[in-house]
Amino acid sequence: MGDEKLSRHTSLKRARSLSESIKGLFKPSGISGSNNAAAPSSRPGQDQAHSHQTARIITSNVSSPSISPVHSPVLQAAPKHHKLGVPNIAKLSLSPSREPSLNSENEMFSQESFISEKDEDEANLLEREDLQNKKEEKARAKHVRSKEAYVPHHRYTVGSDEVERQPRERLKNFPQNAGSSNPANSNANHVLDQENNFSIDAMLDYDEESKLRRRNSLGVRNHSNRTRSRKNSLSTPRSPPMKNGNGGMNSNATNNVGNGTGNRIYMRGRNHSDSISASSLPKFQEIECKCILDLGHFKVFENGYHEHSLRVLPIITNNKNVDSGDEKDADASVNSGDDGDNDSEANMHKQKSVFSLSGLFKSHKDGNQQQQQQQQQEENGEQINLEKAFSIIPSQRFIKSQTLKKSRTSNLKNGNNDELMKNDGKNIPQIVNPNAAVGVEELKLINALSEKIRKGLKSENTKGNNGEGRSNSNKQEDSDDTEGKAGTTNDDTSHKPCSQKYGKSIGVVGAGAYGVVKICARCKTAKDVLPYSTYSNGKKLFFAVKELKPKPGDQIDKFCTRLTSEFIIGHSLSHPHFEANAMIAGNVSRTTPPKHVFNAPNILKILDLMEYSNSFVEVMEFCASGDLYSLLTRNNISNESNNGSSRLIQTVKEGSGSPLHPLEADCFMKQLLNGVQYMHDHGIAHCDLKPENILFQPNGLLKICDFGTSSVFQTAWEKHVHFQSGAMGSEPYVAPEEFIRDAEYDPRLVDCWSCGIVYCTMVMGQYLWKIAIPEKDSLFKSFLSEIKDDGQFYLFEELRHVSSELNRLRKIALYRTFQVDPTKRITIEQLLQSSWMRKTKCCVVYRHLHTKVSK
């Protein structure tokens, strides 16, 4: 038995291959059969019917199923059970030099077995046959399962006629010397006997565990290890490779069991780094593209993309102390001249001239008038003291959109709708348009601000009340109102003065009828996280502060309406919370997060509204590259190289404007249309689009500002769009239907006309006409006659683009935009979907930005 075990271990590989080759010899139908030869396809049930003729298998103590097939005891089988003659084994030609003799130590078909069977008692024979039949049925069932589950990798093709079961008589007539145990025959056939014993044992007595172990031999185990490695590489974190004894690198691997010959070691996963950067992928690899056009502020590359590099205002770049982080030094450097004397008037006027924010004010003044106004305010002491200006926005609705959205959504989810549905004792109408910018929250804020503004303006005329007392009174009222409401918290920054929240003034960038626009700067703090709500140079944050004060003789109600409407519209667009209206309307589940709560990239952020005495301060996002008007007037690009137009309109503004490159103008046009479309989707039309109301960041991001004359054509409780009448805005950009007396028009189509004028201004350097009235403007009259007679306008025909196809598509869009009949005019949405805009490459990627309102 010791030699038997040793031979089994040493011939494991060969026994594996041989056992697979003769697997067909031990099919279920071959375990029991009749005396006559049965066909290979005989059903197991047919053999079971003749089980009384089945040979017996004489065994010793049978091993338990838990023992491995390699170490299970050898089974001795009667020749009439296997019906396997030596001539059939010889037909396999596994070893042609070997004789068909069996091993003397492990002979399974020995002559002594036949002799012992003849001398046994008949009763014992029947008892053994019954016992053996039960074992054969169990073995047959196991063999069927193993045959269905196991498919060998290598199979020898053996004809069915060569593996026929032999008759019992043939085995009985086997020669007596067939079991000779001479050393030569024993050594030659020892491996064959080991393979036969191993295969019989594995086929009859192995359980599910041993079957899996048998299946995981060398070839199958390697395959399973590779499969397991792929799964592990995806589900478990990879450990870094370790150095082996030879200095090489070894990754985590699964060793092959029983493989002591140095087989391949498969790693747990692919050999790559622990983390992969998106920039390393082919799609995101930064490939240096050749620049084919460089205009300083605008570059175009050979792959079709472009880059904006707009200049930052000198008030930021020329002020050395702005980057120093010292607010006192920065403030002093602006308010003192070169000789150290206080020369704030001249310095502010000089800085103001490089940036135009005249669009924020309806009264356009030249530089001398603005200087005189600034000087008069300083002499009269009418400058707003930012250190004493406090916010009049209720704390629970204040500034940060994240905090604002969180508190409102929390109140709605908790079912606290009673407070939202109250408006001075009156119920708010039912919400039918939840996407409208003016809804429940805005209505409440309008009422609260209007009351505070009127109260502040009237208290100025009351004797015994000064500005400081009024500001402190407002501060105390806001604090008491905040603390008195359940579920609200008093923010540390909500009641700080303007100078602490937004920094000190570093200069003036604009002036108008109601005051001036200053720039305030403060150092960044740990609470300032990306993305910033305004421009930052890395060390400081900059804010635009617009001072508003009613002129003598102005009606309080008129000033209050303008101030509140401008702030409310801008604040609601830049800090949208349309989920509140949607939840109240029942269109959004209280447990479902809002889907359309985000800031529009092309809308200027309105941050705060503050008060000091009878003056007010509106805090806005600061755009460091100025407005479109300043960009057009300081460019030095030839007209012929950009649009090819030989006939230019006479410049009617100060200075000579220079047009933009068509690709740059197309990018700005697409941003402008997206911003206007965002306003239209939320029920607001701008009604005063012009270069002065279009601001830029240094990277070319466009911002729409000045919502003082905007029209709310649909609120949250209005089902249909309502029109308006009367001309609004600046004359060169006003649509012709606005000049028709007592005629109503769609404010959205007015914005589309204005966008067309703005684009022509960008590519031509000036606007088309002074006013869209044929009796007052000869050029507009010429436009009407040419369109009526020829169907085209010579200025549009002479425009040139980088390609003839883009030029053709642009002309089609322009003709549809400048339809005098508003019913035939293209809409902003249709213009965005035109072939011209779809082929325009834009710097801003717009995703899920627009949500339509009800019509």
Curated annotation (Swiss-Prot):
Please state every residue range assigned to the domain named Protein kinase: 503-837
User: Can you tell me which residues form the catalytic site?
Assistant: D688 (proton acceptor)
- One example GO MF annotation: protein serine kinase activity
Q: Which reaction does it catalyse?
A: L-seryl-[protein] + ATP = O-phospho-L-seryl-[protein] + ADP + H(+); L-threonyl-[protein] + ATP = O-phospho-L-threonyl-[protein] + ADP + H(+)
Query: Where are the stretches annotated Disordered?
Result: 1-167, 214-260, 319-347, 401-429, 457-500
Principal EC category: transferase
- Residue ranges under compositional bias (Basic and acidic residues)? 125-139
Q: Which UniProt keywords apply?
A: ATP-binding, Kinase, Nucleotide-binding, Phosphoprotein, Serine/threonine-protein kinase, Transferase
Which residues get modified to Phosphoserine?
Answer: S17, S19, S68, S72, S160, S273, S277, S324, S333, S336, S358, S391, S395
SMART domains given in the database record: S_TKc
Low complexity biased stretches: 57-74, 249-258
Cellular component annotations (GO), alphabetically ordered: plasma membrane
Q: What does this protein do?
A: Protein kinase involved in salt tolerance and pH sensitivity, probably by regulating plasma membrane potential and cation influx. Positively controls the TRK1-TRK2 potassium transport system in response to potassium starvation. Stabilizes TRK1 in the plasma membrane by preventing its vacuolar sorting and degradation. Also stabilizes other plasma membrane nutrient transporters like CAN1, FUR4 and HXT1. May itself be subject to regulation by ARL1.
Report the family membership. Answer: Belongs to the protein kinase superfamily. CAMK Ser/Thr protein kinase family. NPR/HAL subfamily. HAL5 sub-subfamily.
Q: What is this protein called?
A: Serine/threonine-protein kinase HAL5
